[in-house]
Amino acid sequence: MSQPHSVPNTRALALGALGVVFGDIGTSPLYTMKEVFGGHHLALTQDNVLGILSLIFWALILVVSLKYVLVIMRADNKGEGGILALLSLVQGQAPLRSRARWIIMSLGFLGASLFFGDSLITPAISVLSAVEGLEIGAPALHPFILPLALGILVGLFAIQRRGTASIGRLFGPIMLLWFAVLGVLGAIGIAKHPQVLAALLPIHAIQFFMTHGTAGFLILGAVVLAITGAEALYADMGHFGTRPIRLTWFGFVLPALVVNYFGQGALLLAEPAAVRNPFYMLAPDWALYPMVALATAATVIASQAVISGAFSVTRQVVQMGYAPRLVIRHTSATAAGQIYIPFVNWTLAAGVALLVLGFQSSSNLAAAYGIAVTATFAIDTVLLALLMRVNWNLGRAPTLVAAALFLTLDLAFFGANAVKIPEGGWFPLVVAVVVFTILVTWRRGREIVGARLHERGLPLAPFVESLLAHPPARVGGTAVFMTTDPSGVPLALLHNLKHNKVLHERVVILNVRYGEVPYVPAEHRLAVTKLGEGVFHVVVRYGFMDDVDIPKALAECPCGMDFDMMDTTFFLSRENLIPARGDGGMMVWREHLFATMARNAASPMTFFRIPPNRVVELGAQLEI
């Protein structure tokens, strides 16, 4: 579990969490009530308004507060959260059969794939909904809404390579102001029509379903907009800790959101014409443009959190062996977690731009929003149930009760969003399928390559014995041969010995392994085995969120070897993969996809941060 924090530190972390964790869910009031009543043409009666407010309130209580903040946040993996950390906890401790393990692993990575679909929609719908407020005061500005939103989003993606450390310290104070304004505006609205407070009672939600039946169920597809971003509270737990996030949620964010939603409901009862944009019309006329500016800043911050999350998840799947190596650049000299991945950044930028141009408005985008989020909710619940039963040793009855409650809610929201698939919900699902296909294809391809290399390789022990029996010429210095097969001789080493007839004075066979934990302690980073004849087998272990730096790891080697980088040469193998026309364990199209990804993967030299002038690359053809 996360360590307790001092009071001053907790306050600082709470302010930081405001600027990162709560951006997505905190900007939902911009469009939720508008979509519920405008998008579904729901009559603005008192019963309907109270019913919707009750649904939103209890969704915030049951899904966000109970499920995520109080229950799932107990499942920290060495202090880290998120669906992959949750998956690693289940995989690491549950005594599962191979097929069950494969199903659970697939569920976890499907959840990660769905996140990327959500990562495209969140910036688009958030920024669009913010700048659409300009139309209220000046309808003539309508033609400029799309260009302005695109300009803001393109600018946001363009500055990613420089990092956000310099402006990141402003995120917390801006979001503090945002939530304070949400609360004040909501309170003003409630004062005009305090009857809306009756919606705190769940009876109004129940009566709404009884009155509207199937139509009431379908409106859950818009109500879910109020809880998008719930998973971020768990995913960002490692950055801020459980206590600051819980205190900020219950003490500030949740009250501000509830009061604002209820204020919008009161406004709709008093002025039905406000349905065109109840959020902005809740503010006084003089405050419209300042509110647009503040909302735009808040949505940019929310989008930044999603983009940073996409970088983080990408690094995790790469280091877990489910995606090809990508160029990962660090944008901060002090914060290892602040990274920039050019390929992901510009892929997201292109996707977001296409969404804005294709859907044209936040109302149209709302149809695409929700399906990926609710599917992730359901996957989280399944993994949580396994964790509760196996890792937490809870009895069958409490596990079933909790799983039934959460899964009923998740599937209800998912079902209501499923009907929106033809209207736009297909988009995040297509993105998720593409990403999931890439992940499983890369994993399977690497397994096939590993098997082929093992077949062609030579076991380490006989190789070292052959050096003793037939010693080759030796030259000074250290040669490091990287390999994925911990028990075999690297092909680069065999090729070097075959063609050059010499070995370096000291030979290091280096195997990099990634564990199912976020971080590996420094004392467990290296394992060194002396094989004799100047040959060492070194295993370097990393967690899926560790900063990978091979020269740094070798410099800290506890084996009595002083690594002089100017006296060390790294020998890397680059396989030229040839698809085997479906005979290698994958369909032909997957073989070609894998070969394409392998050709375009970042060089090991770049990924492992090895100086280019110390690298020799040797190629080899390999049929997959």
From Swiss-Prot:
Per the UniProt record, which residue ranges are transmembrane? 13-33, 52-72, 102-122, 139-159, 170-190, 208-228, 249-269, 291-311, 339-359, 368-388, 399-419, 421-441
Q: Which UniProt keywords apply?
A: Cell inner membrane, Cell membrane, Ion transport, Membrane, Potassium, Potassium transport, Symport, Transmembrane, Transmembrane helix, Transport
Q: What is this protein called?
A: Probable potassium transport system protein Kup
Any GO CC annotation of this UniProt entry:
plasma membrane
Provide any one GO MF term from the record.
symporter activity
**UniProt family annotation:** Belongs to the HAK/KUP transporter (TC 2.A.72) family.
Against InterPro entries, the record matches this protein to: K+_transporter, K_trans_C, K_trans_N, Kup
For membrane topology, the record states: Multi-pass membrane protein
The task this protein performs is described as: Transport of potassium into the cell. Likely operates as a K(+):H(+) symporter.
Would the keyword Phosphoprotein be found if you checked this record's keyword annotation? Answer: no
Per the record's keyword annotation, is DNA-binding included, yes or no? Answer: no
Subcellular location(s) of the protein: Cell inner membrane
One Pfam family, please name it: K_trans_C
What is the reaction catalyzed? K(+)(in) + H(+)(in) = K(+)(out) + H(+)(out)
Name the domain of life this protein comes from: Bacteria
